[in-house]
Amino acid sequence: MNDTVTIRTRKFMTNRLLQRKQMVIDVLHPGKATVPKTEIREKLAKMYKTTPDVIFVFGFRTHFGGGKTTGFGMIYDSLDYAKKNEPKHRLARHGLYEKKKTSRKQRKERKNRMKKVRGTAKANVGAGKKPKE
């Protein structure tokens, strides 16, 4: 059943500066719903002989009438480069990043402390307490 889905890549570019390959991905899926990103990652991994964990796909838009979806993809040389260069929200989608959430009260107190000072001193107040040495 998955044979009806075709993945094509275009505008392929090797970005040596960021240790990745980047491309536009066209997914042809006539008469079917939009293909999940996990499935696209797995198929790209087979095409480029790598593992799905270093592949990041995003920005998919299905064309009017369905049947064709276009998006963007990047394949990193290693997971370390991916963690270094990818935005945090994309890493979070893969489960590679967890944002630390401060409590509501702490955020409000910090905001009110910052209101009391002006200029460059604001950075010192916003930094919080210094760690004990």
Curated annotation (Swiss-Prot):
Keywords associated with the record: Acetylation, Cytoplasm, Diamond-Blackfan anemia, Isopeptide bond, Nucleus, Phosphoprotein, Ribonucleoprotein, Ribosomal protein, Ubl conjugation
MF (Gene Ontology): RNA binding; structural constituent of ribosome; translation initiation factor binding
Record GO biological process: cytoplasmic translation; erythrocyte homeostasis; ribosomal small subunit biogenesis; rRNA processing; translation
Chain intervals with Basic residues compositional bias: 101-119
Cross-link Glycyl lysine isopeptide (Lys-Gly) (interchain with G-Cter in SUMO2), sequence positions: 37
Location of the region described as Disordered in the Swiss-Prot/TrEMBL record: 92-133
GO cellular component: cytoplasm; cytosol; cytosolic ribosome; cytosolic small ribosomal subunit; endoplasmic reticulum; membrane; nucleolus; nucleoplasm
Tissues where the protein occurs: Mature tissues, such as adult brain, skeletal muscle, heart, and kidney, express low levels, whereas tissues and organs with significant populations of proliferating cells, such as fetal brain, placenta, bone marrow, and various glandular organs, contain significantly higher levels.
A Pfam family hit: Ribosomal_S24e
Residues recorded with modification N-acetylmethionine: 1
Modified residues (Phosphothreonine): 9
Places the protein is found: Cytoplasm; Nucleus, Nucleolus
Homology family: Belongs to the eukaryotic ribosomal protein eS24 family.
Subunit description: Component of the small ribosomal subunit. Part of the small subunit (SSU) processome, composed of more than 70 proteins and the RNA chaperone small nucleolar RNA (snoRNA) U3.
UniProt xrefs under PANTHER family: 40S RIBOSOMAL PROTEIN S24
Chain's role: Component of the small ribosomal subunit. The ribosome is a large ribonucleoprotein complex responsible for the synthesis of proteins in the cell. Required for processing of pre-rRNA and maturation of 40S ribosomal subunits. Part of the small subunit (SSU) processome, first precursor of the small eukaryotic ribosomal subunit.
Disease involvement: Diamond-Blackfan anemia 3: A form of Diamond-Blackfan anemia, a congenital non-regenerative hypoplastic anemia that usually presents early in infancy. Diamond-Blackfan anemia is characterized by a moderate to severe macrocytic anemia, erythroblastopenia, and an increased risk of developing leukemia. 30 to 40% of Diamond-Blackfan anemia patients present with short stature and congenital anomalies, the most frequent being craniofacial (Pierre-Robin syndrome and cleft palate), thumb and urogenital anomalies.
Name of the protein this chain belongs to: Small ribosomal subunit protein eS24
Species this protein is from: Homo sapiens
